[in-house]
Curated annotation (Swiss-Prot):
EC number(s) given by UniProt: 4.1.1.48, 5.3.1.24
Gene3D superfamilies attached to this UniProt entry: Aldolase class I
GO terms, molecular function: indole-3-glycerol-phosphate synthase activity; phosphoribosylanthranilate isomerase activity
Record-linked SUPFAM superfamilies: Ribulose-phoshate binding barrel (SSF51366)
Region of interest (Indole-3-glycerol phosphate synthase), ranges: 13-275
Lineage, highest ranks first: Bacteria, Pseudomonadati, Pseudomonadota, Gammaproteobacteria, Pasteurellales
Name of protein: Tryptophan biosynthesis protein TrpCF
Keyword Isomerase: yes
Stated role: Bifunctional enzyme that catalyzes two sequential steps of tryptophan biosynthetic pathway. The first reaction is catalyzed by the isomerase, coded by the TrpF domain; the second reaction is catalyzed by the synthase, coded by the TrpC domain.
Highest taxon of source: Bacteria
PANTHER family, per database record: INDOLE-3-GLYCEROL-PHOSPHATE SYNTHASE, TRYPTOPHAN BIOSYNTHESIS PROTEIN
Organism whose genome encodes this protein: Haemophilus influenzae (strain ATCC 51907 / DSM 11121 / KW20 / Rd)
Amino acid sequence: MMITQDFTKPIDSATVLQKIVLDKAQWVKAKEKEFPLSQFKQNIQNSDRSFYDALAKGTHQKPAYILECKKASPSKGLIRAEFNLEEIANVYKHYASAVSVLTDEKYFQGNFEFLPLVRDIVSQPVLCKDFMISEYQVYLARYYQVDAILLMLSVVNDETYRVLADLAHSLGMGVLTETSNEEEFERALALGAKIIGVNNRNLHDLTVDLNRVVELTKKYADCIPADVRIISESGIYNHKQIHQLQKVAHGFLIGSSLMGNQDLNNAVRSVIFGENKVCGLTRAQDVKIVYENGALYGGLIFAEHSKRSVSLRQAQELVTAAPLRFVGVFQNQEIDFIVKIASQLQLYAVQLHGAETEAFITALRQQLPKNTQIWKAISVNTEAQSAVDFTDDLNVDRYIFDSQTANQQGGTGKTFDWSLIPENLKHKIILAGGISPNNVEQAIAQGCLGLDLNSGVESSAGVKDQEKVRLVFNNIY
């Protein structure tokens, strides 16, 4: 079967997509002259990494992740000026089910030369993300060692799709079939697509609607075969979105939100695992365990009367054990002391767990390094029945809502009434107090930014229990 679809003529009244496809047809024509298929076809070998097997592992409970290498886009312009593929791939290899690489030159500043550079570093299948309209591009993608291609049903008709998909399969490659509306989703099902991507971005005007994947999967729920995997594409910026959409999607393709973050490793961890903290760390092996299980933050307690208090010397050893974002916990201590510890340990944040006033916080903010956040614990009595009375302080980046008993603030091992959490501040609240494997699912359901774990994952004060840590994080993501 030959492709008869003419890509040199406008595909519809679309603007951005139409222009990209018209330019792509010109690019293909020029590339074929510059590097004819006859020069490299005989050197092509089939892929030995299965894209389908890698994505088949994705479930609603444990989604698959296609993490993307993207320098720029039409909607955002330049996203990552320091586009170091070696650095990016060395992060992605620890978390991805597959790695996507943009190869469109004009609109995304991509290049086919990027593909083998990434594939040499990662063990996962590599996806060539481009506007595929010709057999030449499919051969070229495999020549550059990719394991899967993207076929967009907003671009190709059914005849073209079959030709390109069949060719990809004959070369051992998989296909990510992209849809963006009901008609395209129906076509994907009829074409027998194994991995169906739902692009939440409107390619005509570049707006994003995360409800698209929800609406399409619900409407066609009875038509989607059990072995087909649904991938949500575009618009994913945080773990809360993952948690909401994994009910309908088996995986996520994430690019722009990661590429725009200089701290790529923690950006990936934040999206996949959420913003969760394990506090009261006293042993290097525990720091490693909580990092490996998905914690983003590690809490080091400097409050004098805590059973989990550490010295500066101990803390200096702990912060080298794993690249957590470390948070120092202080209680009614002098500003000079807090600033000294924060500076020497290069803390990500200082957490105030005492009666620190707004004036104290303002003064602390002026003396702390600019990139060190201030977190404030709000202690809620375990017997409390009325709403928490406090005013949001703009100098506070995160609130820790924790349990308080008559004798103790924090580390009580008890929960408070979670219905008292202010709904309008959940986006900057981390929930603490008695969270354990037994109640972590209910804690997640409160919809806070993240969870703060301590005594609920310990075997004794300051000693984390590896199995409890594993059980909690298994429920979190």
